[in-house]
From Swiss-Prot:
The active site is at the interface between 2 subunits. The proton acceptor Cys is on one subunit, and the charge relay system is on the other subunit. InterPro entries: 6-PTP_synth/QueD, 6-PTP_synth/QueD_sf. This is Putative 6-carboxy-5,6,7,8-tetrahydropterin synthase. Pathway: Purine metabolism; 7-cyano-7-deazaguanine biosynthesis. It comes from Pyrococcus abyssi (strain GE5 / Orsay).
Length: 157
């Protein structure tokens, strides 16, 4: 490897999951109504192998996406809690769902952009000092996705 100037190591992982959501919009749109998608999430993580020889454990990614699968994803702005239920008030509607069927995200809306951001933040919580970059892409359909990239401080900075 005499001629090698640098090495970049990156892992890639992808998974589909089914979830429903609705959007807060100031204009009339079908997306204001509860609807679902078969999302596809793609994750790329750049870094160096840790003491176990991994940049990041794929099992953490699988468990994270399992929490979203077949759930209703809502913004924390729209909810209140009542005896094991989540009450969701939005767009002149009130939904009462068991807590186990809802994922409440700490974002102002439930767009693909904010879902990607939420996923990237959960990955960051489990990332070691060996991770340099986290990229998350969330596809709502075969034609459209949102992507976020987190560039992390180098070790010891």
């Amino acid at each position: 490897m005499k001629r090698v100037v640098s090495i970049k190591r990156r892992i890639y992982w992808t998974k589909e999951f089914d979830s429903s959501h609705f959007l807060e919009l100031e204009y009339e749109s079908k997306c204001r109504r509860l609807h679902g998608h078969t999302y596809r999430v793609e994750v790329e993580i750049e870094g160096e192998p840790n003491e176990h020889g991994m940049i990041f454990d794929f099992n953490h990614l699988s468990e994270l996406i399992k929490t979203l699968d077949h759930k209703v994803i809502v913004s924390e702005k729209w909810v209140r809690y009542e005896e094991g239920y989540v009450l969701i008030e939005k767009n002149d509607k009130l939904l009462k769902l068991p807590r186990s069927e809802v994922v409440v995200i700490d974002k102002p809306n439930v767009t693909a952009e904010y879902i990607a951001e939420w996923i990237s933040e959960r990955i960051l919580e489990n990332a070691g000092e060996n991770v340099r970059e986290i990229r998350v892409r969330v596809w709502e359909d075969p034609r459209s996705y949102a992507e976020i990239t987190l560039t992390l401080k180098p070790q010891g900075s």
